[in-house]
Amino acid sequence: MDMQNITDLYKIDKKTTLYPNIINKYNYMAYLLFPNNATIFNSYITKKEVFEYPMQFAIALYPVYKLYWHNINICLNNRFIYLSNEFKNNISINTVYNLLYNNELKFEDDNIIINGKNLKISYSAYSYVTIISQITINISSLNKYQIYGIIESANYLGILSSYKQNKYFDKNLFSFTKSELRSTMIDVQLKIFEIFISKKNCIISGGTGIGKTTVIPKLFWWFNLLFDGYEFWNTSNENKNINDFIFKPNFEKNKTILSLPRKALIRQMGINYIKSLGFDNISGSPIILKYKDVKKEKEYYNNNPILYPFVLSVNRITINNIKHSNSVIIDEIHEHDKFGDIAIAIARTKKKKYNIRNIVLISATIESDIDNIRIYFKNIVEIYIPGVSLFPVKEIECEDKDVISILKNYMPSVGKSVIIFYETIKKINEYKEILESILIDKIYKIYTIHSKITNINAIINKLQNDKKHIHIILSTNYLESSITITNATLVIDNGKMYQKKFLTGSTMYITESMYIQRKGRVGRISKGTYIRTYSKDLLQTTFKHINYQYLWEYILVFKYNNMDYYNDLFIKPDDPSRIENTLNYLKNINIDIDKYISLLYSKFNKYEINMVEYLSIYINNSTSDIILLNEFIDNIRNSDKYIFPYRLTEIFHKLNVRCRCINITETEEGNINCSFVILNNYDGDPFFKLSFEKSNLICRYNKIYYIVSMSPLYLID
């Protein structure tokens, strides 16, 4: 095939190119790369360029037919034949084909004259009519005018890119913003394209600020937009039959799905993608956000999505959206969010059944996970994209753990932010009071960010745009992944996190990947400083979250999806007998998952079921009892205002999830710690603690209480 090499078109740095062997392998993609508008430009391709190397552009027939010609009409108006999605002035394809076949044509710069008929036809319409009417020919038989007609339509769509900037239509599908992140460069794009067309799975890791979250998923969506449904990548383009090329593919609008652990990440990434594609707001864009109650939020709910959907979903909702997805991308896998691990398991197990093209895992670091990933995914492609901070980050190990003295020595300038990591919400609130009592100058603004804060995006937007204050942000590990605070120049990190373990939890040191993520909160927009008040040899090397989680949610989801409870797990518990113990417990409390799995799964998706015992009520109780339970679930987080009905007390007593108070101690601060043991415990640590203010103490030593909620933890007599 007569084509130019990509290396002859684009400037390729041989020293930094990660995949030199594949660049000229895909020369036909030279003008269909994702435009970063820094080195690859969203461009208008000229007739001259097409005529010089027509076969270089032939593959554009597929996305043009898919995105434009597939639902187009031929129109005749003012003696001009053209393509339009209008339903007026239509003319049949056979009529136009006969006009073209039986008359002499004069090919001019902008259109084609049909001699003797006083008619003109656009190159797009000429190409459409002559190609659709001769679908048995090979692509190699297309003439340069037909190929230019394809490109004229592609120019109209705005899906073409080039090594040089050219004019383009004002009404293109997208208006791409400039990005110089490493993942937008040609070698990485072509590697992602290769994975896409070969239907391979991959694990992607790399340095901070290379575009793991902001770019890589967008590349999979871009190639899905252009080529979803096309399967014939194993032969040369010129040998392909037109019929096979554009009529055999399945044009179902399969989505690209990016799965993230938290709603705040979904919102921030959603806004990022919307703006990067040139949209002012989410409605009318291809971006769809999925998390609980998103329909109530006008800024984040897309009631009019276009084209091939690009879905950003929290892991909890992803597990029900994997079907009809082309590329399933699970980000932040190093966090081992429970539903993230479940989503990985469903995608791998159902890949063939659901015709998933790619499963893509993204992580800051993979050292602790790579052995398991290689076992779980056979022949997975491993991609590492090296990157340094866009700006230098100075790392300091500080023996003085006093945050006040550190701030005095390293306080950022006005308009900048400092992020201080602590392990618990309680610790954050304590230090907020301390800082507010010491930093009394009005120049300082102090914020807390954690999972209980509902308006995180609004807080971040406010402090990023406020140039008149110094912003001090106290955060749990909530801020360590993906969320970028553009004016952050300083991070102070005690290296600790609170790890939930069944009904209790403990403070522990963070992992290597978490350290990298926290350090990476600075150095993206400007130079920064990372101060740690711990030694790096205290970092955790391995930690299995599943060893400290109840397994009933895994079992319920796996049962519904006909998956093996143990072998299909992405991360397996060290003690496999826990699975059998959980299954036996379900039987003992009259939860027949074999008989009622559809009902149970629907309730599991509709309500925040934080205790497996609730499922027994949905199966065995009356409608009025179920209504009481649902009202309780909706109000549990405002339990101090909730009036507990007597009938609901009876229901929970019957569930019989009991615990005994085994110890009561008073802290130095005057609070009361009560220790409990779960009676008839079937899994995990049976011991847990609750703290009360002395005036609000409600428990008595050796008394039995009933657990009615595990998250938040709530007991009744």
From Swiss-Prot:
Similarity-based family: Belongs to the DEAD box helicase family. DEAH subfamily.
Main location: virion
Superkingdom as given in the UniProt entry: Viruses
Full protein name: RNA helicase NPH-II
Catalytic activity: ATP + H2O = ADP + phosphate + H(+)
Pfam families given in the database record: DEAD, Helicase_C, NPH-II
Protein's organism: Melanoplus sanguinipes entomopoxvirus (MsEPV)
Keyword terms, alphabetized: ATP-binding, Helicase, Hydrolase, Nucleotide-binding, Transcription, Virion
The Helicase ATP-binding domain, residue ranges: 193-384
Gene it is expressed from: NPH2
Keyword Transcription regulation included in the entry's annotation: no
Lineage: Viruses, Varidnaviria, Bamfordvirae, Nucleocytoviricota, Pokkesviricetes
Motif (DEXH box): 331-334
